[in-house]
Every structure is written in C-alpha cells, then in structure tokens.
C-alpha cells in the first residue's frame, strides 16, 4: 500500500487540498472558492464553520472520492490557513463570532496605540521582536473585549484558523510556534513561551492555546471527526501553521538565504535566516522546527488589485486586461500607482495608506492603468527587498508561488524592477503541498523539513531584462516620493476603521 499524506490549506479567496505519496507525487487534488465579508471599511472576516470547517469537509470528501487506493493509506494530516486570525470560542468549542482576519483587517488601530502607551513600544519590541501592527492579534483581542462584551464574557479560548481546524479534528487546543509571532506582546520570541508579564489588561493567559512546533503531532483524528470527514479514525494530525509558512516549505525553502515570494490576493514572503533577526519594519520568527529562523513580511494587496479593477470596470477577462497592458510600455504611460488599497503591511506598517493613480491624462489607456498596478507591485516588492538588505538579510534564491505568479507578464515586470531572478517550482500546489510534507515529518517519515528537496523541483527561471532598468529606477524613485508626499493627505478619517 502506497503511504500518503493529506495537506489542506485555507486561503483568503479559496481552499486547496491534496493527497501526496511518500515520493512527493500528487495522487489527487481539489480546490473550492470562498469569500470574505467586509462588514465595515477596514474590517475583514470569515465564518469559521461555514468556510474554514465547511471547506475542510467538502475537500476531504472530494479527495477521498478521487483517491485510487484505500483511505487507510493516509498516514497523516496537516492544515495551514490564513493568519494570524482571531477566533473566540466558548467552552463547548463553538465560535462566538466570525474570525477576524490577518493584517488586512485594521479595526484595532486605537487598541494598538493603547497597548503601546501602556507598555511602551521599545519594551514590546525588546520582549517580542515585533512592533504592533494590523497583523497583531492582541490589539484585536482587546478590541473584542472592549466592543463586544457579550462575546468576551463567553470566550473560553482564542484560536487562529489552523488551531480551530486542529481542534475540530483532535479536540486539542493548539497554536504553532511560528504563528505565535502574531501574538505580541504576550509571546516571548526567544523563549518560545507565553509571557504573562505583558498580558495585563489584554486577556487572561488561560484563554491562549498550547504552543507546539508545526510538525508536532497535536493528536489523532477523533471518531466524530472521522465520521464527518470520511478519513480513518486515529490518523495523526500535526499542529500545522499559517499558509505562508507551508507555502515556503512547499516551494523548497530549506537553506539559509532561500526566500519564498507568495503572490496571492495579498503578498507574503519568508526569508530563511541563520538566527533570529528582529527588525522594526519586518517580523522575525522561529520557523517550523527547533533551530530554524525566518524574517517575514508582505504587501496587503497584489492579486486583489487586479480583481478590483476587473470588477470595477467589468467586461474584460484577465487575459484581455493583460493584452491591453502589453500595448502599454515600461513606465505605464507616465502613470505611477500606489497599491495600498487595503493599507500596507511591510515595510511601511501603515494601515492608513491609500491607493493612488498619479499622472493620468486624456491620453492614458486602460492598458496603462493595468500596467501601472503591475509595476506598483514590483516597486513594493523592491522596497521590501531593499529594506531587508539594509537589515543584513539577503536573499540568495527566490522561489515564486501563488495564483498571481501564473502571470508571466507580472513576474517579468517584478523581476525587471527588482533585478532579482525568480524561480518557479514545478509543483505549483503551494501550501497544501507543504502541509502534506509537514504531515510526513510529523509521522517520522522524514527527519526534518530540510529534506523538502526530496519532493520539490524548480521548473523555470525568470531573469531580469536590463533594457528597462533606467525607466524602472526612475519610476521607483517616483513611487517612493509619491507616498511620502501624499501620506498626510490620505490619513484615514476618525472612526473609519473601528468604533470610537
């Protein structure tokens, strides 16, 4: 019987799953789209049962129906999800409200300032290696405590999306150590433990789950979960992690200097480093197993920019938009765009940032507008890479993955703007592929995540074209200057992202 492993990833706009054998061959795969809700500007949520758990059940049934061997051959399960998210549950394990999503949700700006004023920015950074931002969970937890007292009164545990799925599968409350970086100021980065000394007015420590490494077995599949999923009872379930970490693993990040660049609805990148490197503009973290470290960051919008444009000006397919962009040229007809349509994460850490189209004229075309957004993504990636290099963290090899990476036009523009070669893996499943490998590591079929090269092969290399370098260098300077010149005009009005 060919031993195999199930990996499943819950993303911002879709969920994907695959069953992979011990040699890294994909036996079957499936995906399902879903939406997120935006009840108010700056608020982003998903229903934990309908989307997170519902997608898991749907995809399990689909995979098991397609699997051409006994389901008993599945020797491990791992999940990854968007994150860090905030989901309060009651004593019965029932969600009390929709899950609050990661850095694109900016409702807790007042709470960020409140925590910083009470504890001090430098105290928080010294203990956790993080600056508080819209990516941080604790300000959102405090927001719930202040604004939804009826929810807070019933809250027994606070989970992230992956933790909720692991709970549904095993009955155990867990959080992986990589994802715990999102819980500043109550997570001690170096000790890898919860730290009650800075929790104070935020929450009681017993509301937090148990901390485990991502490939550690959290428990076995319960009989109830087996009946619901169709999986055999007793299958080991590992702790899992955030989607970007599994995406990095699934693209072949194994050595220090390897960097995963994920292009999805948003962007996230992970650079493997030889040690912890806390930097104010980014997020330093332990990685998926003891002795592994990363520096991470990401842009708030990438694929969502092009989705917005297509929905706002309907009637053209993605291919038609890209063909129009081909009729434009480097420099996008003089249009410079700022891609901050949902604020910006790294390196700006500015949730109040706004999108901008600058330099338009009656001669501007739809292709110029589309290309200006493509170039804006490239400029944003370049900004991040430059700031990481200033901090002493350099990428020796970049692996590109995610739905937006399927656009060779976009990938070439980003490569030309940054001057960095990008590699595309042969297997493009991404996070769920990394999840399957995590499940295999948890089952002791591999000794370490560093053996991922036994599964992953790189297929294509995209190298920079020098012909447009001068144009893009000038465009990049204009891009940087445009943000600095307009940021004071674009501050969010009072009350837009939260309750006063």
Language-model features and meaning:
Residues 1-98, 126, 154, 226-227, ...:
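N-terminal glycine/serine-rich phosphate-binding loop of ATP-dependent small-molecule kinases
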Residues 6-7, 116-128, 133, 142-174, ...:
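Active-site core segments that coordinate phosphate-bearing ligands/cofactors
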Residues 24, 47, 77, 105, ...:
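Residue-level signal for inorganic ion chemistry
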Residues 65-103, 131-135, 166-187, 210-213:
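Short beta-strand-loop/turn "lid" adjacent to the catalytic site in phosphate-handling enzymes
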Residues 74, 206-208, 395:
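Core-facing hydrophobic residues within beta-strands of well-ordered domains
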Residues 87, 110-114, 247-249:
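Pocket-flanking alpha-helical
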Residues 101-118, 436-437:
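Short alpha-helix plus adjacent loop in nuclease-associated cores
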């Amino acid at each position: 019987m060919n031993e195999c492993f199930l990996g499943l990833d819950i993303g911002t706009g879709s969920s994907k799953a695959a069953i992979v054998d011990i040699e890294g061959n994909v036996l079957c795969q499936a995906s399902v789209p879903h939406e997120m809700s935006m009840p108010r500007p700056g608020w982003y949520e998903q229903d934990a049962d309908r989307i997170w758990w519902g997608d898991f059940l749907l995809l399990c049934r689909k995979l098991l129906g397609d699997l051409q061997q006994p389901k008993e051959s599945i020797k491990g399960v791992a999940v990854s999800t968007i994150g860090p998210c905030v989901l309060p549950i009651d004593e019965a394990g029932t969600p009390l409200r929709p899950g609050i999503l990661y850095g694109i949700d900016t409702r807790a700006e007042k709470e960020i300032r409140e925590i910083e004023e009470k504890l001090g920015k430098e105290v928080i950074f010294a203990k956790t290696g993080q600056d508080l931002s819209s990516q941080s969970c604790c300000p959102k937890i405090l927001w719930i405590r202040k604004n939804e007292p009826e929810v807070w009164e019933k809250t027994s545990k606070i989970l992230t999306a992956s933790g909720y799925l692991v709970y549904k599968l095993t009955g155990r409350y867990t959080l992986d150590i990589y994802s715990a970086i999102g819980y500043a100021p109550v997570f001690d980065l170096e000790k890898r433990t919860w730290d009650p000394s800075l929790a104070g007015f935020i929450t009681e420590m017993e509301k937090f789950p148990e901390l485990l490494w991502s490939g550690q077995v959290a428990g076995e599949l319960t009989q109830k979960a087996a009946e619901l999923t169709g999986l055999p009872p007793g299958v080991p379930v590992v702790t899992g992690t955030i989607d970007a970490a599994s995406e990095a693993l699934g693209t072949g990040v194994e050595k220090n200097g390897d960097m995963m660049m994920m292009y999805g609805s948003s962007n996230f990148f992970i650079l493997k480093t030889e040690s912890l490197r806390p930097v104010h503009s980014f997020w330093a973290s332990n990685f998926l197993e003891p002795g592994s470290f990363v520096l991470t960051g990401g842009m708030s919008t990438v694929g969502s920019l092009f989705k917005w444009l297509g929905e706002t000006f309907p009637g053209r397919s993605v291919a038609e938009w890209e063909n129009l962009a081909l009729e434009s040229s480097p420099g996008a007809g003089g249009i410079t765009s700022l891609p901050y349509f949902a604020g910006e994460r790294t390196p700006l850490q500015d949730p109040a940032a706004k999108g901008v189209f600058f330099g338009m004229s009656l001669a501007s075309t739809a292709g110029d507008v589309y290309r200006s957004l493509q170039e804006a993504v490239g400029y944003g990636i370049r900004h991040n890479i430059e700031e990481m290099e200033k901090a002493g963290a350099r990428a020796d090899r970049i692996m590109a993955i995610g739905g937006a990476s399927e656009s060779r036009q976009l990938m070439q523009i980003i490569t030309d703007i940054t001057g960095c070669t990008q590699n595309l893996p042969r297997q493009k499943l991404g996070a769920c592929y990394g999840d399957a490998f995590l499940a295999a590591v948890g089952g002791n079929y591999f000794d370490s995540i560093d053996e991922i090269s036994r599964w992953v092969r790189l297929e294509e290399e995209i190298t920079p074209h020098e012909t447009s370098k001068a144009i893009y260098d000038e465009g990049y300077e204009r891009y940087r200057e445009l943000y600095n010149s307009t940021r004071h005009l674009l501050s969010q009005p009072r009350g837009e992202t939260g309750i006063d």
